[in-house]
Amino acid sequence: MAGSAPLATARAIPVSVTPDGRGLNDRGLNLNLARASQFLAKKRWPPGLIKCVQDNLHKYAYRIFIVDDSGSMAASDGNRLVTSANGLHAKKIQCTRWSELAETVKFHGELAYMSQAPTEFRFLNTGHPIQVGTTEDGGTSLSVLQGMLSESPGGVTPLCRHVREVTHIVQSMEQQLRANRQEVSLTIFTDGESSDGNLAAALKPLEGLPVRVVIRLCTDNDNVLYYWNEIDSNLELQMDILDDLFGEYDEVR
């Protein structure tokens, strides 16, 4: 597994620290925007989109990704984009939901490391949260994340527990976030419903906090979409519900 690779010597980045020890992107002072821009340019992102990413890196002091690694993610109704060697052509191929998720989460992990934007990845059933971008660790934390993504999914969907833990994190950061006019970004990758309680009730304490929530669905199942839309309609949250890349493209085309 990638996490067993030799540890690199980590050089601490001077970021603000919350009471629970989590580092914050304090007004973007510690970001490596040049390296982030180079990373995105190599992926052939246009300058306008790169500028949008840079703006978001400043806006969000901390990023949290909840990653659904439950057994249902092994279903083979996902989609993935495969590009040609020269990056000029791409095609959609069918894959497991987990493969679709893993490709996207890997990208966010790489961006967090390249930009040194403090980011936390929380797998529903496996291990402890992985922090990327809080120190210049030679890519060790990114390797751990990639190793987790190479494992097979299995287990249930305890979203409520993780949402409650994230709420405590945001509450611990609230004073500094408001002082800096920043927010926390929370993205939930999932293909279903919570298995450990009322998710709307778990999300409700986030109301009024400086946090934006994105639900990234890894399925086009109508019942799952209805479930999440119902939650959204009953909460006063900054919340967006997104289908896969191709579904979003079809909506705006």
Residue ranges with predicted function:
Residues 77, 154-157, 192-235, 242:
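VWA/integrin I-like adhesion module and closely mimicked acidic/polar interface patches used
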Residues 13-90:
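Acidic, polar low-complexity linker/tail segments
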Residues 3-26, 50-60, 221, 226-253:
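P/S/T/G-enriched low-complexity
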Residues 58-61, 96, 114-119, 154, ...:
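Eukaryote-biased feature marking scaffold/signaling PDZ-domain proteins and nuclear chromatin regulators
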Residues 57-183, 185-189, 194-196, 218-226:
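Von Willebrand factor
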Residues 52-57, 110-115, 168-180, 204-205:
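Surface-exposed acidic, glycine-flexible loop patches that form ligand/cofactor-binding
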